[in-house]
């Protein structure tokens, strides 16, 4: 029976080696925080335990030694004072009331002069007249204003005139829209040109001819007898009478004037008798010459 030898003791552990931290990590780790007024004052910060406090002190001493070996100043002991909270490069945000006031001041339009108000009244008066006399809507007036004279376009092209500050037809249309909406146009030059052009509208005061209340007979229906009674045809088709075949006794009396039949056919007889008269005259002249 073999004797059991006592267990051999475990081999001794090698001593721990401490490696200095790299300068990049050291700079990141030792950057001063703006949240603390003093770099090493931790009196007001509660530590979770005594072990953590010891570990923190050891790490602080280690950072000091590494910084001294690299020839750098200790970042934590710098004399630079940290600005208190709320101060620094960043300016305090502007209040919403101040910003709204600036926007309102910039958006405020200059006061309108009496000439501008007179131009606006002229434009509105012309719009009312066009709607009353010409039955034109605002869209039709706007499209008419936007049409540019082709003669002006050709003249500018031949002369090479290109003025970027010139008032265009679109500017006039925008001014017309603003006047129609009850606002004062910002472009006062466009307002003046618009008022001048609107007042020079041709035949502005002349009223449009009134349309007939009932459609009358067309020229073809008056001159041609189709042999179809329009009233009977409309009853069979169950539709309204066609304007080309509508019979209106009152309109017929107004349009047609009574002419005697003798006067009407006399012109036809006279034109027909001219060749006969000429032929008879030639025969008589020849017969008279033959007798001599």
From Swiss-Prot:
Bilayer topology: Single-pass membrane protein
Q: Which InterPro entries match?
A: CEST/Y3IP1
So where does this one cross the membrane? 267-287
Composition skew (Pro residues), residue ranges: 1-15
Can you say where in the cell this protein is located? Plastid, Chloroplast thylakoid membrane
Keyword Plastid applies: yes
Point to the regions of Low complexity compositional bias.
49-58, 94-112
Work out whether the entry's keyword set contains Plastid: yes
Q: Where is the transit peptide?
A: 1-67
Could you give a single Gene Ontology term from the biological process aspect?
Answer: photosystem I assembly
Any single GO CC term annotated in Swiss-Prot or TrEMBL for this entry:
chloroplast thylakoid membrane
Region labeled Disordered — which residues?
1-119, 206-225
Q: Which UniProt keywords apply?
A: Chloroplast, Membrane, Plastid, Stress response, Thylakoid, Transit peptide, Transmembrane, Transmembrane helix
| Record's function text | Involved in light-induced chloroplast development and growth. Involved in the plant response to abiotic and photooxidative stresses. May be involved in the suppression of photooxidative damage.
Family listed: Belongs to the Y3IP1/CEST family.
This protein's name: Protein CHLOROPLAST ENHANCING STRESS TOLERANCE, chloroplastic
């Amino acid at each position: 029976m073999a004797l059991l030898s006592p267990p051999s003791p475990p081999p001794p552990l090698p001593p721990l080696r401490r490696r200095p931290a790299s300068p990049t990590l050291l700079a990141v780790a030792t950057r001063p925080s703006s949240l603390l007024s003093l770099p090493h004052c931790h009196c007001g910060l509660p530590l979770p335990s005594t072990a953590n406090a010891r570990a923190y002190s050891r790490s602080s001493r280690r950072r000091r030694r590494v910084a001294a070996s690299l020839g750098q100043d200790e970042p934590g002991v710098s004399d630079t004072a940290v600005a208190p909270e709320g101060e620094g490069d960043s300016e305090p945000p502007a209040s919403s009331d101040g910003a709204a006031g600036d926007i309102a001041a910039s958006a405020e339009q200059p006061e309108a002069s009496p000439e501008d108000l007179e131009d606006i009244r002229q434009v509105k008066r012309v719009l009312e007249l066009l709607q009353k006399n010409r039955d034109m809507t605002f869209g039709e007036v706007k499209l008419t204003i936007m049409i540019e004279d082709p003669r002006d376009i050709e003249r500018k092209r031949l002369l090479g005139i290109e003025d970027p500050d010139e008032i265009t037809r679109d500017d006039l249309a925008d001014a017309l829209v603003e006047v129609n909406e009850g606002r004062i146009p910002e472009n006062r030059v466009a307002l003046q040109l618009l008022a001048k052009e609107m007042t020079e509208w041709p035949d502005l005061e002349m009223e449009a001819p009134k349309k007939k209340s009932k459609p009358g007979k067309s020229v073809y229906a008056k001159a041609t007898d189709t042999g179809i009674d329009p009233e009977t045809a409309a009853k069979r088709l169950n539709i309204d009478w066609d304007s080309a075949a509508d019979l209106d006794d009152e309109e017929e009396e107004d349009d047609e004037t009574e002419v005697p039949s003798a006067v009407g056919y006399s012109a036809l007889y006279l034109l027909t008798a001219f060749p006969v008269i000429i032929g008879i005259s030639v025969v008589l002249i020849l017969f008279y010459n033959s007798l001599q």
